[in-house]
Amino acid sequence: MSKKNSELKARFRRSPEWKNFRKHMAELYDNKDAITGKPLRKGWNLHHMDMAVENYKDLCEDKYIPLNRASHELIHTAFRYSYAIDKLVYYVQKMEEINKKKEK
């Protein structure tokens, strides 16, 4: 992302329009992280699912989700490696099976 785009986004995030929308979205999700269901922590992110810079100001509820920092990093990583999601699910399930056997 260019420096100019970063500055435009930062300026928009300081606007009352953005701040009100951000608050509205947190309330819409009961002040919980959309992925984990945990309470939103200080510094939480309102994640834009539409990655196009030109759509940054399109404040449509369907294009945003509130996330804590770790979930926000996770969703961006998963997006970059979306081709590997099926493998990730397979290995996580395998880990769960292995660790359930140890609990018995």
Residue ranges and their predicted role:
Residues 4, 19, 30-32, 67, ...:
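Intrinsic-disorder/low-complexity regions
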Residues 1-20, 37-39, 82-104:
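A boundary/linker detector
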Residues 63-74, 94-104:
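Short Fe-S-cluster ligation motifs
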Residues 34-66, 75-81, 86:
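Histidine-centered nuclease catalytic patch
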